[in-house]
């Protein structure tokens, strides 16, 4: 499983998005490994402006598996946030929650967002991130 973060979806959906990121997302989709979580879905819907983007989102909802955010995910997110803060690293809470979701489900996280690199620098590679 590869949890695709909003940052990578944005590159994938834009004609001028980073070609390497677009290729990684495309490969995950073609292999059937791509998934998302409720936070990513919300962020994408929040940015969907026109009819075309909304149509794409409805299609994504139909075909892309969603990783649940459970009570365990929330506890893990709180621990990741605590570890980051203790190390002097401040990252958005939504990114911490997405990282926790990937870790809980054993999914690799596909992203184009430096904040996930900061989280990894604190917590290491114990589980995919």
Go through the PLM ranges and name each one.
Residues 51-55, 84-85, 126-129:
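Short, hinge-like loop/turn segments at secondary-structure boundaries
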Residues 1, 99-129:
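Acidic, PIN/NYN-like endoribonuclease modules and their adjacent C-terminal/linker elements
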Residues 5, 37, 90-92, 113-114, ...:
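Histidine- and aromatic-rich ligand-binding microenvironments
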């Amino acid at each position: 499983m590869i949890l695709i973060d909003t940052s990578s979806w944005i590159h994938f959906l834009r004609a001028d998005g980073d070609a390497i990121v677009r290729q990684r997302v495309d490969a995950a989709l073609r292999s059937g490994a791509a998934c998302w979580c409720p936070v990513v879905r919300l962020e994408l819907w929040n940015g969907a402006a026109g009819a075309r983007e909304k149509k794409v989102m409805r299609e994504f909802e139909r075909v892309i598996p969603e990783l649940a955010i459970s009570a365990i995910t929330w506890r893990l997110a709180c621990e990741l946030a605590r570890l980051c803060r203790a190390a002097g690293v401040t990252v958005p809470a939504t990114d911490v929650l997405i990282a926790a979701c990937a870790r809980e489900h054993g999914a690799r996280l596909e992203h184009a967002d430096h904040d996930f690199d900061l989280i990894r620098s604190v917590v290491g590679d114990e589980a995919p991130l």
